[in-house]
Design a protein with these regions (language model features):
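Conserved short loop/turn motifs at secondary-structure junctions
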Residues: 73-79, 83, 99-103, 226, ...
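Beta-rich, aromatic/charged-enriched effector core domains that present basic-aromatic interfaces
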Residues: 78-192, 374, 528-532
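Hydrophobic beta-strand scaffold residues
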Residues: 29, 71, 122-123
Length: 545
């Protein structure tokens, strides 16, 4: 009987899992997860996300046991562990999904391909829906994404038969993996829990989601982000569940359903950008921004991290992140305001912000987190009319995002007695710091800096020479300063797998296709109105001035 190893990575489910379904049809299955120290101790890995991972693995094992199988756990470098498991189990080969989240993972997978080929062993890679190998213009990718989301879900195998002689390790605790719990509440990590969250959203939040998404106090997000990060539920299953629910003729629900599906597409679109350009994990899209360097003040950085900037909505986001890992409580708008403050108003390298976020976010996903950070810093879409994303963190932000002060008062109890109209610029008091910067002056400096930098390439029809290449040194940002498992970066590196775009070999058609992923090239600077917008209404918010 055929024997196939199914290597689980960020696809911790039994439903809509093509490698598992195919392996189960062939015969015996060895479902394996490898605890990889280089990922567990990556500079951006935090204990809360590892704790969620452990919960997801326990749930996956339970689901496999319901099918007659079990999850085999191993520890070590997959490049060594998996070929040895092939030999021990007498498997014919390995099935696995490709994964483009991390440069390290693509280096590891390339090395694994080499090791298996040298040993005469086989591996078959499956691209998950929404991750495409070819370079497409973004509109074509968008069409293909919707097509793939409508394709039939891979069925759950009726049985997963595991060879009885293949033995795994027991599920370790957090401390055994070298992490200590930091007090964040960890949500249930099973597929059933993810399905319940989605159903709760569709029944109780969909009539409000689109209109209240920008208000952190409303808490209308789905709560699915950590489950999607680890593939506890597939994006395709989410999309099809939303479509199957229907809107009952309610235009508000219809708009919210469309918005949520768009958010799922955006998230996978960030992953596709990283598939093309993995250097976005380490660098800004345009080389000039990193080559000129960034200011760094450790005291100001600490004030931003801990929520002591003197801007209440920024400080509330800071404290919420550290207390909750962002789960359900820290929505996109809050994250954007918090991020823009560091990179634009404080003038610090956006990568320090991404590093801090990833260490705390339970749902931290590198392409989503890093690309959004670069966008907020103004170093990605800087040839477009939306090239600046500088938020006013004062009363304007409170009026538009937290008009009743619910979010701020929850996380800043020292300001709980103030009316909402004072929460943007609270009166001085000994229990809360004064603002650490002048918003108007900081904004003026940042706009002038970005305008000067982007003039280097704004009027050229050929942006390719200005894009940052994949660096020779692949050491993760923060590794040299804050430690982590980075020894892998010192070894000779094969071409990544899946392969990245070779910027030196793109023809004009390819260059035009790549350009569409980073918005259209324009030369007209954005117009700004000095008229103050009214306080928040029931409509979805746009970017702040």
């Amino acid at each position: 009987m055929h024997r196939t190893i199914v290597w689980f990575r960020r696809d911790l489910r039994v439903f809509d899992h093509p490698p598992l379904a195919r392996a189960a049809r062939r015969g015996l299955v060895i479902p394996v997860f490898v605890f990889d120290r280089a990922l567990l101790h990556h500079p951006e890995t935090g204990p809360a996300r590892v704790e969620f991972l452990l919960g997801a693995l326990a749930a996956l094992d339970a689901d496999l046991r319901q099918l007659g199988g079990r999850l085999i756990l191993r520890s070590g470098d997959p490049v060594q562990v998996l070929p040895e498991l092939v030999r021990q189990s007498q498997a014919e080969g390995i099935y696995a999904h490709t994964d483009c989240e991390r440069i390290y993972g693509r280096v590891r997978d390339a090395r694994l391909n080499q090791a298996l080929a040298t040993a005469g062993m086989k591996i078959r890679w499956f691209d998950p829906p929404g991750s495409l190998p070819e370079l497409l213009p973004y509109p074509a990718y968008r069409r293909r994404w919707y097509e793939q989301m409508g394709e039939a879900l891979a069925p759950c195998p009726p049985q997963v038969a595991v060879p009885p002689e293949v033995i795994g390790e027991p599920l370790p605790g957090l401390a055994q993996l070298g992490h200590q719990a930091d007090g964040k509440p960890i949500p249930a990590a099973s597929t059933a829990a993810a399905q319940a969250l989605l159903q709760d959203f569709l029944e109780d939040k969909a009539d409000r989601y689109y209109w209240q998404l920008s208000y952190p106090g409303a808490e209308v997000t789905t709560g699915l982000s950590p489950h999607l990060k680890f593939g506890v539920m597939s994006v395709r299953q989410c999309v099809q569940t939303i479509r199957a629910q229907g809107d009952g003729g309610d235009p508000r629900r219809r708009r919210s359903h469309q918005q949520l599906i768009s958010r799922l597409r955006w998230g996978q679109g960030f992953g596709q950008r990283f598939r093309y350009l993995p250097q976005l994990e380490l660098r800004s899209l345009y080389r000039i921004f990193d080559e000129e360097g960034w200011a760094f003040d450790p005291d100001l950085y600490q004030a931003w991290q801990t929520g002591h900037t003197g801007f209440p909505i920024v400080d509330a986001a800071a404290r919420c992140l550290q207390a909750t890992g962002g789960y359900l409580a820290l929505n996109f708008r809050s994250r954007a305001i918090y991020a823009s403050f560091l990179s634009n108003l404080m003038g610090m390298d956006w990568r320090y912000g991404a590093l801090h976020f990833m260490r705390h976010l339970i749902d931290g996903d590198c392409p989503i987190d890093h690309y959004q950070w670069a966008m907020q810093a103004g170093v990605t879409h800087c040839v477009d009319k939306t090239w600046t994303r500088i938020y006013n963190p004062g009363q304007a932000a409170v009026d538009r995002c937290d008009p009743e002060g619910q979010f701020i008062k929850r996380w800043l109890p020292e300001l709980a007695d103030l009316p909402p109209q004072q929460l943007g610029n609270p009166p001085r008091r000994p229990t809360y710091p004064a603002p650490i910067l002048d918003y108007k002056a900081a904004r003026k400096r940042r706009v002038a800096q970005l305008e000067r930098q982007r003039q280097r390439f704004l009027h050229t029809p050929h942006l390719l020479p200005h894009l940052a290449p994949l660096p020779a040194d692949l050491t993760p940002f923060g590794g040299d300063r804050d430690g982590g498992e980075i020894r892998w970066a010192a070894a000779p590196t094969p071409p990544l797998f899946p392969p990245a775009l070779d910027l030196t070999s793109l023809d004009r058609t390819d260059q035009a296709a790549l350009r569409t992923w980073f918005v259209a090239h324009v030369t007209i600077p954005p117009s700004r109105s000095s008229r103050r917008r009214p306080a928040s209404t029931g409509e979805q918010l746009s970017l702040l001035d």
